Amino acid sequence: MTAQLIDGKALAAQVRQEVEEGVAAFIADGWAAPGLAVVLVGCDAASQVYVENKIRQTEAVGMRSERFLLPADTDESQLLTLIEQLNNNDAIHGILVQFPLPPQIDVSRVISAIHPSKDVDGFNPLNVGRLAAGLEGGLTPCTPLGVMRLIRSVHPDIAGMGALVVGASNVVGRPLARLLLQADCTVSIAHIRTTDLARRCREADILVVATGVPGLIRGDYIKPGATVIDVGISRVRLPNGRDKLTGDVAFEEAVEVAGAITPVPGGVGPMTIAYLLANTLQAARAAVRLR
């Protein structure tokens, strides 16, 4: 068996097209283009590339973007002041603070300072609580939304299927488990300290792995025909001295067992940014409904 490759780039392009059409309709209704503010503290090279990619894609779908580049020695109060200004700016519908932040800044305070209605990352405690309670109206983390779209591209109806999420972070694992549960999956959560992880993986119809441990899930961990979504991405050094991007799943082994699988790169990553755009449009629509 050779697994179907789930093309995250193609699906992300579909999401961006949907957002672009939604933005055009929003503007045609007489509203200003949705606005996304992106805040970067420091000069981490990888973060700068990621921010520029987000801004480029934001503008490509017809939304406005504003970047705020702050020095690495910015203190917490300065960042919180900027966030408050953005909270009060009606032209800004989404606020994204690029992580990681310098050590002098408390990440949890920053997340809580972003108004829930503009929290396009979906990390504010109020949005987390809405998702946990199954309430509508909140913003959901982008990567879990992207993972659900990837899964539904293979299984439009996942009710009754068994899903295992390996990884219990607040960014991916926990919110994703909630979304799967809302879709009537039978959901379990595991992590790197779970005993007998291989057995638990082999019971799953849908296996999502988000641990940041390269090659954690071997081919013999996978139920034949299962759908495997690899959220992890790590840079590993090969014997020849070159670097390679790899996921949490041993791809060459897994592709011979799974029914469908995401590649790394080109699987989950493009979907995360696509749903950042979708969340920004959702936030803009919600804002005008309140006027």
From Swiss-Prot:
**Pathway noted in the entry:** One-carbon metabolism; tetrahydrofolate interconversion
Q: Which reaction does it catalyse?
A: (6R)-5,10-methylene-5,6,7,8-tetrahydrofolate + NADP(+) = (6R)-5,10-methenyltetrahydrofolate + NADPH; (6R)-5,10-methenyltetrahydrofolate + H2O = (6R)-10-formyltetrahydrofolate + H(+)
Question: What's an example GO cellular component term for this entry?
Answer: cytosol
Pfam family membership, one: THF_DHG_CYH_C
Which domain of life does the UniProt lineage start with? Bacteria
Q: Which of UniProt's keywords are assigned here?
A: Amino-acid biosynthesis, Histidine biosynthesis, Hydrolase, Methionine biosynthesis, Multifunctional enzyme, NADP, One-carbon metabolism, Oxidoreductase, Purine biosynthesis
Q: Which GO terms describe its biological process?
A: L-histidine biosynthetic process; methionine biosynthetic process; purine nucleotide biosynthetic process; tetrahydrofolate interconversion
Q: E.C. number, please?
A: 1.5.1.5, 3.5.4.9
Functional description taken from the UniProt entry: Catalyzes the oxidation of 5,10-methylenetetrahydrofolate to 5,10-methenyltetrahydrofolate and then the hydrolysis of 5,10-methenyltetrahydrofolate to 10-formyltetrahydrofolate.
What is this protein called in UniProt? Bifunctional protein FolD 1
Gene symbol of the encoding locus? folD1
